[in-house]
């Protein structure tokens, strides 16, 4: 994508070295430009890579993925970015277990309907669910997304809910507090 998640991670962890990868050449160009314009540019790197075939001698403390949300054959404008054709959850989990440290974390943002399957899949690769955030678009609304964090090291499971809007076009205090260092806007 644009490198937004990497930029946010860099802002929160100023000493972290961040490698972003994407299979889409235009996305890599855009992320590269955004990284160059960032005050964190020395800690950010982007490469045109297919994660399935990603080779490295390094291990990572954190792998973050915001994968495509639509299954194959769904109607979508940007087919590659919106289909689980190039990188499916199995590929993601399997490759991540190869490159995270023993105490490392795999963090996946995904549609709520995929959460149960991804939890089962992670267990197949000896990953423990250590954190689950249930994301609601609006207070009282349906569960939309989950952030699932897995580790090779077993830890107590943390579960929390996160609400983006308390009413239409009115951000929740929770959202404003979390994003206050990334935006300037009023309540």
Locations of regions flagged by a protein language model:
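Conserved SAM-binding loop of SAM-dependent methyltransferases across substrates and taxa
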Residues: 2-15
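Conserved SAM-binding motif I beta-strand of class I
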Residues: 17-22
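A short acidic, Gly/Pro-enriched loop at the edge of an enzyme's catalytic core
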Residues: 52-63
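Mobile active-site "lid"/loop adjacent to the S-adenosyl-L-methionine
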Residues: 67-92
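SAM/dcSAM-binding transferase cores
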Residues: 142-187
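Conserved SAM-binding loop
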Residues: 31-32
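Conserved SAM-binding strand-loop segment of SAM-dependent methyltransferases
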Residues: 39-51
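Conserved Class I SAM-dependent methyltransferase catalytic core
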Residues: 88-148
């Amino acid at each position: 994508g644009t490198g937004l998640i990497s930029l946010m991670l860099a802002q929160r962890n100023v000493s972290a070295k961040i490698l972003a990868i994407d299979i889409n050449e235009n996305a890599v160009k855009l992320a590269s430009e955004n990284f160059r314009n960032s005050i964190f540019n020395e800690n950010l790197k982007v490469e045109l890579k297919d994660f399935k075939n990603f080779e490295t001698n390094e291990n990572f403390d954190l792998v973050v993925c915001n994968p495509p949300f639509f299954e194959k054959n769904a109607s979508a404008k940007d087919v590659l970015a919106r289909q689980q054709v190039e990188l499916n959850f199995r590929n993601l989990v399997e490759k991540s277990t190869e490159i995270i440290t023993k105490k490392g974390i795999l963090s996946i943002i995904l549609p709520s309907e995929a959460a149960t399957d991804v939890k089962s899949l992670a267990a197949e690769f000896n990953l423990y669910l250590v954190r689950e955030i249930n994301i609601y678009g609006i207070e009282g609304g349906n569960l939309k997304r989950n952030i699932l964090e897995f580790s090779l090291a077993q830890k107590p499971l943390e579960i929390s809910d996160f609400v983006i809007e308390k009413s239409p076009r009115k951000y929740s205090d929770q959202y404003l507090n979390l994003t206050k260092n990334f935006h300037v806007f009023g309540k």
